[in-house]
Amino acid sequence: MQSSKGRRKVGSTTAGAGIDSAEKLDELLISSAICNGEDLGPFVRKTFGTGKPETLLHHLKFFARSKESEIEEVCKAHYQDFIHAVDDLKSLLSDVESLKSALSDSNSKLQSVAAPLLSSLDSLVEAQTVSKNVDLAIGAVTHCVRVMELVSRANQHLQSGNFYMALKCVDSIESDFMEKTPSSTLKRMLENRIPAIRSYVERKVNKEFGDWLVEIRVVSRNLGQLAIGEASAARQREEELRIKQRQAEEQSRLSLRDCVYALNEEEDDEFGSGHEGSDGGSSGGGLLGFDLTPLYRAYHIHQTLSLGDTFKQYYYNNRDLQLTSDFQIAGFFIVEDRVLRTGGGLISKLEVETLWDTAVTKMCAVLEDQFSRMQTANHLLLIKDYVSLLGVSLRRYGYAVDSLLEVLSKHRDKYHELLLSDCRKQITEALSADKFEQMLMKKEYEYSMNVLSFQLQTSEIVPAFPFIAPFSTTVPDCCRIVRSFIEDSVSFMSHGGQLDFYDVVKKYLDRLLGEVLDEALLKLISTSVHGVSQAMQVAANMAVFERACDFFFRHAAHLSGVPLRMAERGRRHFPLTKSQNTAEDTLSGMLKKKIDGFMTLLENVNWTSDDIPQGGNEYMNEVLIYLETLVSTAQQILPAKVLKRVLRDVLAHISEKIVGTLCGDLVKRLSMAAIKGLDVDIQLLDSFTENLTPLLTDKEAREMKKAFVEIRQMINLLLSSHPENFVNPVIRERSYNALDYRKVATVSEKFRDPSDSIFGTFGTRGSRQNPKNKSLDALIKRLKDVS
């Protein structure tokens, strides 16, 4: 404790000079802060923080004493200026007194001079008042005269029926003159007569508007008929243009160079654009000439009467009633379109759309009801055509007809079902009237109507007449029915809002051909075909139908506006395949029955004879005579491919019949001569096949011989030196692949040499056996082991 006190004393002694300099610094800082207007708070806090406020007070007092001298100098300077200013004011006092006396003298002189002028001014004011009253009287008289002139002019306009000008005169009187009219009598007269005049004008205009409403009903009916007729004429022109285009395409397809070119002149009419002009009164003598002047006049007058909104509602209500009662759609909405565009707001677009929606809803309901009751395709098509024409007519004016077209599309299936039913009846009648005779055409127009119109010709060369066609009358009759079906289907599908409808037409065309025509032909074949000639004619007809079906699909694509290459790309198989196969099978079956009649002569063949028939057996000669006669007749009717299929089937049947006879109970034993006789018979069949060279190519002739390959291989096996080779798989596959081992075993057993039998061995014991017989015995043994 003593040492620390000693250190403090030393510090205070040595820092005496430092404390004085610190006080001077604080004094300068406080002076500077006061001069600069700074905050003295930090100094105050510091002073009280150290516990020595006397120092701060000392500094503030010192600063105040230092500023007293400055204050005294400033006060002395301003005191001298104030003294000088007081002296200057005292010097001006005498001048002000002299000015006051001068002003008093001037006022006295002015009063003496202005007294006469004031009396003259009073007289002037009195004269001006009198003049003003006279002017007011003249103005009142002039006002009354102008009012009477307007009244007279209004009466003249009322008498001449110029109601608008009469109302303008009345409005002018009411707005410009009536409040200013000085005559109370005249004013009361105007107040009583103006409402009466307006009421009179309103009654007259309403009567004219009522007459127009009655007249526009008749105009709408005629206008609708005219619009539908024009749309129909435009559609007819389009159809004619399409026909010309088809003819040009046909000429191009046939490479005809002599073509005729013509300009297509299109008539510009008011229906084409749907905008007939901007004249609010009438159409100016065009196709849509109807007068709207009474309507617009009534609307204008009601606007003048400030009843425009009332008249709008009145007009809308009356037109709504007319639409509901008359239901004249086309003409009604053509008129409304004109009123919308030229009526100056008489009816709004929303109101027209509301009327249209009402009409469309009612039309759709009526169409749904009528379509559900219809049982005739023609009636449905007529209504569809009319509705589509209505849609075309009103679409030009911007009305949405999609709902109507959707109703038509919804009944597309029903229409086609009815159309299929009608075609089924027509096809049945056409087939029942068929006499199964080739069609005779005496004139070129008959050829064009029955052959060229359906592209049934096989050559571009026109034949000589009379011409006998390979088909019967049922072919062109059915073609006409199918073509009519296609055209009716396209007519229903076109002009209905759907652009790509070929697939729909094709679907129903497939049904017509695959269900209706095919089933009718199958029924005809099963019930009415009783002879070879009839079956041959039906088979020939089927071949022609195959070409006709190609035409049907091309025709449908053409009418639908689809390129032929796309239609060919989507083609399927021949839709009449069932009836075609049935017709050929029926023909083959009847021919087989005929052949079976000749094959009964196989019973007369001596199968154990040792003599070889040089010219073949009797049955084969009869069969060949019949086949040659058949071919010569069939070549004139049947196409080559059909005749080939039928002949192949018949030849295969002959082969099966011979093999069946050899394997049957009729033949107990076979001799070598009998087998060689069969070989002669088969050679005759080969010759017959080879003689068909104009009909068959060499390749086709070889294919035709495969029809009797079974009997040929059987004969070759029996005539071979080593029949045992049949059991060799390689040789069998190469030379005997058509033979059945059971049939071979049966025939080989019958062909065995009787000397090799059990009872024949006694006479030949010890002699050498024939190698062929030995091979045959081995074959029989091997086949028995297999079985």
From Swiss-Prot:
Component of the exocyst complex involved in the docking of exocytic vesicles with fusion sites on the plasma membrane during regulated or polarized secretion. Involved in polarized cell growth and organ morphogenesis. During cytokinesis, involved in cell plate initiation, cell plate maturation and formation of new primary cell wall. It comes from Arabidopsis thaliana. Gene3D superfamilies: Dsl1p vesicle tethering complex, Tip20p subunit, domain D, Exocyst complex subunit Sec15 C-terminal domain, N-terminal subdomain. The keyword Transport applies. The exocyst complex is composed of SEC3, SEC5, SEC6, SEC8, SEC10, EXO70A1 and EXO84B. Interacts with EXO84B. Binds to EXO70H1 AND EXO70B2. Binds directly to B1L. This is Exocyst complex component SEC15B. Keywords: Cell wall, Cytoplasm, Cytoskeleton, Exocytosis, Secreted, Transport. One of its GO terms (biological process) is intracellular protein transport. Belongs to the SEC15 family. The gene is SEC15B. InterPro entries: EXOC6/Sec15, EXOC6/Sec15_C, EXOC6/Sec15_C_dom1, EXOC6_Sec15_N, EXOC6PINT-1/Sec15/Tip20_C_dom2.
